[in-house]
Regions:
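ATP-binding N-terminal substructure of ATP-dependent carboxylate-amine bond-forming enzymes
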Residues: 1-101
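Active-site nucleotide/adenylate-binding loops and adjacent lid/helix of ATP-dependent enzymes
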Residues: 107-146
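Short, glycine/charge-rich beta-strand/loop segments that flank catalytic centers
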Residues: 77-87, 102-109, 131-138
Length: 146
């Protein structure tokens, strides 16, 4: 049986990951964590842990490493963008645990709206015109500002 540790299971993405894995035919044991005990995935996981917030990076990482060791985790699946950044930066500390995240190049592009727009444009994917705050933007509406 493979042991999978999923972070941020209380959010929509975490819930989707947990629910999809539960529906699979894989022999897995799911351990989940979230900053809130009462959440949409609490009853779906085999074990639940209340986690510190990722904003306290060292505290959050110590919590993750502790669970990885004590619960003999095979796979770590960080869900939120900030948690993915932390795990990507420190994944060598996990030794033999497999981390379920994209490769560093994909993360660099996908986690930056400007780089994503440039990448898609170069690839020929139709995208809305993108302006950076240092440029003069459109003078007509409607428009989306992010």
């Amino acid at each position: 049986m493979r042991r999978i540790f999923i972070t941020a299971i209380g959010g929509d993405i975490g819930y989707g990951v947990v629910k999809s894995l539960k529906k699979s035919n894989h022999d897995i044991y799911i351990i989940g964590c979230d900053i809130k005990k009462y959440n949409c995935s609490y009853d779906l996981v085999d074990e639940f842990y209340l986690s510190p917030a990722y904003m306290k990076e060292d505290e959050w990482w110590k919590f993750v490493l502790g669970l990885v060791v004590s619960r003999e985790i095979d796979y770590l699946w960080p869900v939120t963008e900030p948690e993915i950044r932390i795990v990507n930066k420190r994944k060598e500390e996990l030794h033999n645990v497999k981390v379920i995240i994209n490769n560093p190049l994909v993360l660099e592009i996908a986690m930056d709206k400007g780089k994503t727009a440039e990448y898609l444009e170069k690839a020929g994917v139709p995208t809305p015109h993108t302006w950076w705050k240092s440029e003069d933007g459109p003078k007509k509406y409607p428009l989306i500002v992010k």
